[in-house]
Design a protein with these regions (language model features):
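Conserved H-loop
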Residues: 139-144
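Conserved small/polar residues in nucleotide/adenosyl-binding loops
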Residues: 1-4
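Conserved phosphate-binding and hydrolysis motifs of nucleotide-dependent enzymes
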Residues: 11-16, 95, 116-117
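ABC ATPase nucleotide-binding domain signature region
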Residues: 6, 12-15, 19-71, 145-146, ...
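Conserved D-loop/post-Walker B switch-helix segment of ABC ATPase nucleotide-binding domains
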Residues: 120-133, 149
């Protein structure tokens, strides 16, 4: 069982960390070799890029068919103020947008949670909150991240490319 297992991929810029994730997600990128995954494997993905986020959190939850109450409860655990729930996400900071994607991911039923640099734009306090959420939800995860403290706190096995 891979539940509660976390693998963190590290490596220098350009070593292929994000490309590896994209191959797993079946993105059409040039590669050699064969990539196979189990049939019916459901993956929840948090990309590096947050620039596409716009609209209210309520609209976002409806579009992505996630439980709005759970979504907002997770955001509250990451220090979102209730007043932010009605604001347009295009006005959110980069860190707030990253939290939206993390909360969305944790609301999605999946076999594997793939997060590409989830701590970009995240302050230390929020990092600790994210660590607590990972421990609470216990998802099987594949992450690209450079933060050694984070790796230790979520008890992730490290693979270096």
């Amino acid at each position: 069982c891979i539940r509660d297992r976390r693998i963190l991929i590290q490596g220098k810029n350009g070593s292929g960390k994000s490309s590896l994730l994209k191959l797993l997600l079946k993105y059409p990128i040039e590669h050699t070799g064969t990539v196979t995954s189990g049939s019916g494997l459901v993956i929840s993905y948090v990309p590096q890029d947050t620039s596409h986020l716009k609209g209210t959190l309520t609209e976002f939850a409806k579009v992505h068919k996630i439980d709005e109450s759970l979504f907002k409860a997770i955001l509250r655990k990451m220090d979102f103020e209730r007043v932010q729930f009605e604001k347009d996400m295009k006005d959110f900071s980069a860190g707030q947008k990253k939290k939206v994607l993390i909360a969305k991911s944790l609301c999605e039923p999946a076999h594997l949670y793939v997060w590409d640099e989830p701590l970009n734009y995240i302050d230390v306090y929020s990092r600790i909150q994210i660590e607590q959420l990972i421990r609470q939800f216990s998802p099987a995860m594949l992450l690209v991240e450079h933060d050694v403290t984070f790796q230790k706190e979520i008890d992730a096995k490290v693979i270096t490319l």
